[in-house]
Amino acid sequence: MYYVTLDADNTVYCISAGEVEKVRINPGNYVDKVKTFSHLEYTDEEYAAEIEKIRERFVPFLNICKAHGTAIRIGVNHGSLSDRIMSRYGDTPEGMVASCMEFLRICREENFPDVVISIKASNTVVMVRTVRLLVRTMEAENMHYPLHLGVTEAGDGEDGRIKSAVGIGTLLCDGIGDTIRVSLSEDPEAEMPVARKLVDYIRERENHRPIEASMAPGFDTVATSRRISRVVEGIGGTFSPVVISDRSSGDFEFDYLSLPDYIYIGKEDPDNLPDNFRLLVDAHFWKERPNAFPCFIASEAEELKDYDCPLKFIRLTYMDLTDRMLEILKADKTVVVLLSTHHRNGVGSQRAAMHKLLMAGCDVPVVLHRDFRETDVELLQLKSAADFGTLLLDGFGDGLMLHNEGCEAVVSDRCMFGILQATRTRISKTEYISCPSCGRTLYDLQTTIARIKEATSHLKGLKIGIMGCIVNGPGEMADADYGYVGAGRGQISLYKGKECVLKNIPEEDAVERLVQLIKENGDWVN
C-alpha cells in the first residue's frame, strides 16, 4: 500500500494509482487546506460546494484506480480532521464518520467497490464509538466495506499493549473488523506478535455454546454511558471503579504505585493482616472487623440477611441471576456483585448478565471478575484488557477483580489500573500518546520516551504527546496537555495543548525544557 501525506494537485495520487496495488488517502487533507484549528462558518450551499470540490478531484483518481485495478484505503484519523469538518461537527465521532462517508458515497456513486476503511483515534473511547457509529451509518445506507482497526499512538510497553487491546479487542468482540494493526512505539517487528496473540484470543471463542440473552431496550451501543448503580460504601454510583486484588494465594507483595482498594484473602484469618487493608473474606471465615467484609457464593445467597455488615460481596455468574436472586439483590442494599464467568465467551456471558440486571431494574453495584492462568505477562495484558475493556466501554462495571495463576499478583494489579486508565474510567498515572515512528522521525523515539517517562511519570492525570514529526504530530496528539514533536534533525518543538510555544529547541535540551514548560504552567508536582 502507498501512503500519500499531502498532494497539492492530485498528481502523486494519480501517478501512484497506476503503479501500486492500494493507495491510502486521508479525507482530512485530500482537498481541504492543512489543518489550522480555525473555526469556519459555512452556509449549507457553501458546505455542499466544498463536497463538490472533493468529487471534482476524487473522481479522476478513482477512474485511474479502476483502469489499473487499484484499491484504495480511506484512512480517517481523529487528529487530522479538516477545519471544515471540525467547524461543523466538532472533534467528535460524528465528525470522523461524516468525513469518511463523504468519500464513501462518491465511491458508491461511481461504482467503485475496491475500498477499505480505517478510522482511528488514540483515545479508545472515541475510537470504539466512532467505528460503531460508522458501521451503523454504513448499514443504514446498505454499505459493507472492509474495516481496518487500530489505536493510533498507543505508546509502548504495558500501556501500548493494554490500550491497543482495549480498543481493537472491544470491536473484535462486537464482530467488527477485518484487519488490525497494533501501533507500538517500539521496533516494528514487535507489533505483529502482539496483534497475532490478540486475534488468536478472540478466535478461541468461535463456535461457543449459545448464550440465551436479550439486549436491554433503549441501550445504545454508540452513545454509551455508565450504568446507574446505587452506592454501597463508596462502590458504584459516580465513584471511580474500584480495584480488588486476589491475594488468596498468600502473596502479599505490593507495588505502592498500584495499590488496590480491596484485597481478597479467601479463607485467610484477617487478624493476621494489618488494619490498613480493606479485606474480602469468605463468608464462613469472616470475623467482624471494621476493615473486613464477607464474600458469599451463589448457594449462600439466602444467608446474606444474617450478616450485619455495611458491605457484603457475592460472587455470581449470568446463570445465577434467577428471579429469586434478583429479588435478593434488590432487597439487600449492602451487597456488591462480583460478576464471574466460566463461559468460553466470557465477555458475551458478562454482557448478558449486565443487560439482565438493566431489564430487571436491579441497580446493585457490579465488580467485573475474571480468572486466567497465564505465565506470559503480555498475554495476560491483552486478554484482560480486551475482556474488561469491552464491558467498561459499554458503560458496565463499578470495579475490577483479576485473578491469575502464573504471575505475581502485582502484575494483575498493574493490569487493572492500566485498563481503567486506557478506558478513561479511572486515571491513576501520567498518560503518554506516542507514535509508532516512521522514516520522518529524526530522533531516537524509544530512548526519548524513556527519558520523558523518567522525568514525568509521577504527574498523575497529565497527558503528554511524544510525536516523531511535524507532519502529523500536532494533530495526532489528540487531547494531550503537552507535546514533544520532532521539528527537524536534532530539533524539537514543544506544545501546550494545540499551540506550539517553543520551536526548534536542540534535542539535548528538549526534555529539560519540557519539564520547565510544565512547571511554568502550574502542572508540576514534586
Can you annotate each of these PLM segments?
Residues 1-102, 233, 244-347:
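Active-site beta->alpha loop and helix N-cap motifs at the rims of alpha/beta catalytic domains
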Residues 5-11, 25-36, 76-81, 86, ...:
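Short, ordered loop/turn segments at secondary-structure junctions
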Residues 15-16, 108, 172, 255-256, ...:
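Non-catalytic positions within long, well-ordered alpha-helices that form the structural scaffold/packing
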Residues 23, 72, 115, 179-180, ...:
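Hydrophobic residues within beta-strands of alpha/beta enzymes
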Residues 41-54, 58, 63, 85-235, ...:
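Catalytic alpha/beta core domains of metabolic enzymes, predominantly
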Residues 237-259, 444-488:
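C-terminal accessory/binding modules appended to enzymatic or scaffolding proteins
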Residues 489-492, 499-523:
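Beta-strand/loop-dominated core regions that host nucleotide or nucleotide-derived cofactor-binding catalytic loops
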